[in-house]
Design a protein with these regions (language model features):
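Residue-level signal for beta-strand positions within conserved beta-sheet cores that form or flank
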Residues: 18-20, 64
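General small-molecule cofactor/ligand-binding pocket signal
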Residues: 21-25
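Typically the conserved alpha-helix immediately C-terminal to a functionally engaged Cys/Sec
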Residues: 1-16
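Cysteine-centric redox/oxidoreductase cores and disulfide-bonded domains
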Residues: 26-180
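Intrinsically disordered, low-complexity regulatory regions enriched in Ser/Pro/Gly/Thr
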Residues: 15-18, 124-126
Length: 180
């Protein structure tokens, strides 16, 4: 389902995907009335509009956007011309619907959603990617899988899933390593 990424590592911990409400907002800045992207210019913005369209086209699947993004990053430099088709299929999305959304106009199009995402980032003071919020609070430090998983499990008030014990094991190993 997922590639080898931070989100994959966390969500594959047993039961953790069931306690997480995952939302991604691509980071961009606003220049007059349009979004621009820092790291990869127009190509990064294009990828982000497609990812937002994946989210829009499968609103009941919070992980569709991640599946699309992970496929896209996994194919960078190899299948760029085919990424929309390949990655839409990987996330069980219709490539024509993806293209229509990503190249459309208006607030519900890919570019319109990217502009809204940039406005949200600005309003929250976000200026670096990734910036992670858990229950509305910004996670301090580098979001590694162990510290992010631990923060998620610590914030969860219900019965902890088995995957949370792996966060504790990772934290104990870190503490043990520091004692040596």
């Amino acid at each position: 389902m997922f590639g080898n990424t931070l989100a994959t590592e966390i969500l594959s911990a047993e039961g953790v995907a069931d306690i997480v409400s995952l939302t991604q907002h691509p980071l961009a800045r606003i220049n007059e009335s349009f979004a621009f992207c820092h790291h990869g210019g127009w190509y990064e913005c294009d990828m982000q509009t497609h990812a937002l369209c994946a989210k829009k086209l499968k609103p009941s699947d919070p992980f569709a956007m991640y599946e699309y993004i992970e496929c896209n990053f996994g194919n960078l430099g190899k299948n760029d011309a085919d990424n929309t088709r390949l990655c839409a299929a990987n996330a069980t999305l219709d490539k024509d619907d993806m293209w229509k959304c990503a190249t459309g106009y208006g607030p519900d199009s890919g570019p319109g959603m990217l502009l809204k995402s940039a406005q949200l980032a600005d309003s929250m003071g976000v200026n670096a990617a990734p910036t992670v919020f858990i229950n509305g609070k910004e996670l301090q430090g580098v979001p590694t899988a162990p510290n992010l998983l631990k923060a998620i499990c610590d914030a969860y008030t219900g019965a902890k899933p088995k995957g949370c014990s792996s966060a504790l094991v990772a934290e104990e190993k870190k503490i043990e390593k520091c004692r040596r």
